[in-house]
Structure formats: C-alpha cells, structure tokens
Amino acid sequence: HLTDIHIGGGFLSKEVDEKAINAVATMITKEKPDLVIATGDIAFPVPYMAGTFNNYSGAKAFGNLMESLGVYWTVTFGNHDAECYSYFDREAVAEIYSDEEFKHCLFQAGPEDVDGYGNHVIEVKNTDGIITQAIVLIDSQAYVKNNLIESIKGTYDNIHPNQVEWYENEIKRMNSENNKTIKAIQGDVNGGLHKDFATVKSL
C-alpha cells in the first residue's frame, strides 16, 4: 500500500520526483508484493512547487514505473491528482490509468451511473476460481465544489450514497456467485496478512 507519492512532474520538482520514484522502486523491488495499491495523490501538479499544471506527467510516470517493475497495481484518487487548475480532470486521469499499455494495471473507471472515478473491485480467487476475498476501492471525491477557493479552504467531499449502494450490490453479487459470504482482508497486530489470504495463489 502506497499513498501520497506526490510526483509533481514539473521542472521545479524534478529532484524530489526522482527521489520519490526511486523510493517506490526500491521498496517494491525489496518487498516483491503481489499487488500494489496507491491510494491517492500520486500526482502533485501544484504550480509553485512543481512548476506545472500538468497532472498527466505525474500519473504517466507512476504508471511507467509500475509497469517496469512488472507488478500488478491499481490506484484510487486523492485531491491533488486532478486539481481544479490541472490540465486533466478526474475522468481524463481515469482514462490514463485505463490505457491498455499498462498491462499490469487493474484500475477500472467504474460505472458511469455511480459518482466518482475508480470505484472498482479486485476479486481474490483461489486456484478453483472461487472468490475468497475482495478488495473494494471507492473514490472519496476531492472537494465539495471543484474550484480554487474550495481547494484552498480544504472543503473536502466524501463518499456519496450511490457509491455505498454500489458497494452493497457488489458484495451481494459476489456472495451470490460464491454462495457464501466474502471475507474482508484483515491484518493482524503484527502486520501480517490474515491466514486465509495467505493461502490464495492467484488473482
């Protein structure tokens, strides 16, 4: 699990971007995870710190990095991934991560009739194709109103009712397909994975 990588993608952030990318690459190379989930603020196109409004470059740089490492990955968005002044909105950023060139990316933009971008489920299956657990990713939006004043004030949005309804329906769907209740992934106090998750051999 990664968060707040803050790749500025501009001339002012070149040095710190390289440090962030190298840190991620080192961590993943050492840990060798089966799946990496980045939960927001992958890009950080804040002009006075990055020197650009271009949030495409940060998103693209992260995608290229993950593909070069050959690990499965996905993302959810933070407030900085598509600021009101950024060149690309959340829908456009979702299209970047949905690009077929990212072969290891499990990201999905999600249903059009559900608020937000990136609402999706990753089903963890055993070798018999049975869903043993599920990872549900939900877009918690950015700001209540997508404008500069709200972003400065930090008036953050949240998960909307139709997203909760979507989540409930997805859980019901998977339970119905399996004819059993899907367990949530739980970590123990020592940071290890739940014993049931450790037995899963494939996605």
Which residues fall in each region the model found?
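Active-site neighborhood of phospho(di)ester-bond hydrolases with catalytic His/Asp-centered motifs
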Residues: 2-3, 36-41, 73-79, 184-187, ...
